[in-house]
């Protein structure tokens, strides 16, 4: 048997934090140590507590959490940097006999920790040169070049989207490999099992409405007011923070600001379900099922026994990849 990393995924407000803690406690009852590794990009920022639904002090005391409150809001967290930190943390925990439980928001971040994904980086000089060529030669000429260098990537990309064509050519020049070689693969590089939390849309929308109200009650306006001078270009993109900045500037009233937060959170949740739904390795469970934790533990036991390995090994065959920007 191989002790798997447990990755808990699903839309915002679906209860991932609670399930992660419940699994860790259940494992502890069986004599196995487990700790949580955060995969939510914005929960890594110090002080961004209410707006990111960061685990409370009590929750973090119940089960040790990693990669929370590790950078200041002025700093930048990239998925490539997170990948390095997450894999180092997972390796350290496993070396001490502790099972990592990955709990996260962004699908790309959660996958970056455990999947076959590389991030080639960028070169401003190469990017600028390609952008100048697009202006002088046209998007069609660049796409023809991509088609000659990487037919697989070109076959799946929209020739009317020069930004992605430029990115693909940039990666080819930087790596000397086809752009398609850098695409995310549905292939674990760390033995893992993914558990997804699913809710009917009305139930999820209700949870989001309750969370948004709780953000107001907990002092989200005051949090943003305090953090505003320190929010960098990345941190300020966390959902809800710009709405409160606009509220403080008199652009929104309080009701409209929080209504917009709720609406955009619901939209994000639907996008997240689309993202996670493309991964055939995820074992979906009903978040409101009273036997949720029991069902999750059964999945973990099957994964540790290798029961899912034959299906997981073929996951890439069933998946159409979305050719987006893979950047540092």
UniProtKB/Swiss-Prot annotation:
Its cofactor is Mg(2+). Its EC number is 2.5.1.75. GO terms for molecular function: ATP binding; tRNA dimethylallyltransferase activity. It catalyses: adenosine(37) in tRNA + dimethylallyl diphosphate = N(6)-dimethylallyladenosine(37) in tRNA + diphosphate. The keyword Transferase applies. HAMAP family: IPP_trans. Monomer. Catalyzes the transfer of a dimethylallyl group onto the adenine at position 37 in tRNAs that read codons beginning with uridine, leading to the formation of N6-(dimethylallyl)adenosine (i(6)A). This is tRNA dimethylallyltransferase.
């Amino acid at each position: 048997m191989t002790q798997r990393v447990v990755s808990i995924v699903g839309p915002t407000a679906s209860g991932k934090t609670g399930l992660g803690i419940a699994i860790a406690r259940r494992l502890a009852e069986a004599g196995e140590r487990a700790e949580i590794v955060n995969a939510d990009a914005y929960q890594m920022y110090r002080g961004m507590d209410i707006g990111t639904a960061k685990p409370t002090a009590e929750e973090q005391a119940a089960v040790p959490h990693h990669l929370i409150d590790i950078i200041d809001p002025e700093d930048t967290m990239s998925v490539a940097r997170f990948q390095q930190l997450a894999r180092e943390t997972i390796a350290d925990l496993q070396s001490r006999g502790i099972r990592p439980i990955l709990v996260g928001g962004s699908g790309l971040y959660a996958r970056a920790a455990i999947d076959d994904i590389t991030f080639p980086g960028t070169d401003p000089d190469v990017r600028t040169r390609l952008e100048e060529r697009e202006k002088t030669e046209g998007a069609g000429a660049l796409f023809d070049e991509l088609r000659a260098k990487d037919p697989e990537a070109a076959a799946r990309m929209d020739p009317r989207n020069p930004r992605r064509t430029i990115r693909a050519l940039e990666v080819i020049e930087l790596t000397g490999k086809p752009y398609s070689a850098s695409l995310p693969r549905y292939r674990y590089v760390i033995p893992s099992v993914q558990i997804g939390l699913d809710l009917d849309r009305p139930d999820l929308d209700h949870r989001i409405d309750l969370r948004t109200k709780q953000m107001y009650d907990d002092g989200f306006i005051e949090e943003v007011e305090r953090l505003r001078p320190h929010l960098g270009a990345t941190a300020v993109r966390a959902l809800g923070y710009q709405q409160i900045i606009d509220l403080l500037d008199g652009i929104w009233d309080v009701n409209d600001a929080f209504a917009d937060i709720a609406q955009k959170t619901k939209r994000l949740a639907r996008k997240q379900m689309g993202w996670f739904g493309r991964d055939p390795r995820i074992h979906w469970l009903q978040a409101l099922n009273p036997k949720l934790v029991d069902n999750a533990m059964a999945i973990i036991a099957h994964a540790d026994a290798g029961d899912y390995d034959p299906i997981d090994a073929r996951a890439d065959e069933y998946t159409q990849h979305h050719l987006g920007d893979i950047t540092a």
